[in-house]
Amino acid sequence: MTASPAGKPAGGRERAAQVRTLFSEIAHRYDMLNHVLSLNIDRRWRRRAVAALGWERAPGGSYLDACAGTLDLALELAARPGFRGRVAAADFALPMLVRGLPKIGRAPVAPVCGDAQRLPFAGESFAGATVGFGVRNLSNLQAGFEELHRVLRPEGRLVILEFAVPPGRLLRAAYMAYFNHVLPLVGRLVSGHPWAYAYLPASVRGFPAPEELADLLRRAGFAEAVWFPVSGGIAAIHVAEKARRPGAAPRPGR
């Protein structure tokens, strides 16, 4: 795997190998760095993402968390009062999943080592799916969305939590200064990895804006795709829904 000193993301298969190696190498410090560098605000974002999933429509259903990392988002869903289902937590970086294993306890979460662009599940397997800070790392974004659409049942909902660039001039300037300078420096010092946290701002700068991402979701087959900003627009939550089967009655709770 190769990477520039600035952590510029590669493309295609090289990008996939780069991302897998990167997250495998920082798995041991990933949780701590996430919480510290986000000032713990990432926990609130995950709660809002789970709330947007609408799991109450099928509380005993099967759910997918793709690009699951160390399992925080999967466990957030599994811990909701009234949730009686199961969560398959898929990630192609095995060390990240291993790092999350001690958190599981009795939670109904099953880690699966698998690529979000080639998920090891049959079509229409899940009542809903989540992706937290993961779609930005896919080597083929459209293929990933089409694969998530494939494994969702009709009326299944996909919720994506991802970084964004805030629209306000002052907040954007402060955010980009932190993202481009403070975060890579602190991340490098704490993780010991020479370029992992330089990759993050580079990947965000090259990522589609929320409006473009919603359009890509529609092209992948989702009937509805909306988004809303969180924390002033430094992140966004996208909600997309697979179409109902023709002639089928609406799912209860809509």
Language-model-detected regions and their locations in the chain:
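Conserved alpha-helix/loop element of class I SAM-dependent methyltransferases that forms part
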Residues: R29, L39-G60, E76
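Hydrophobic beta-strand segment of the Class I
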Residues: Y30, A129-T130
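Short glycine-dipeptide loop
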Residues: P59, F83, L152-R157
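Class I SAM-dependent methyltransferase SAM/SAH-binding core
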Residues: S62-R118
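A short acidic, Gly/Pro-enriched loop at the edge of an enzyme's catalytic core
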Residues: Q117-G128
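A short glycine-rich, Lys/Arg-flanked "PGG" loop and its adjoining helix->strand segment in the class I
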Residues: Q142-P154
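C-terminal alpha-helical "lid/dimerization" subdomain adjacent to the S-adenosyl-L-methionine
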Residues: L161-L216, A220, V226
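Core SAM-dependent methyltransferase catalytic element
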Residues: A223, P229-R254
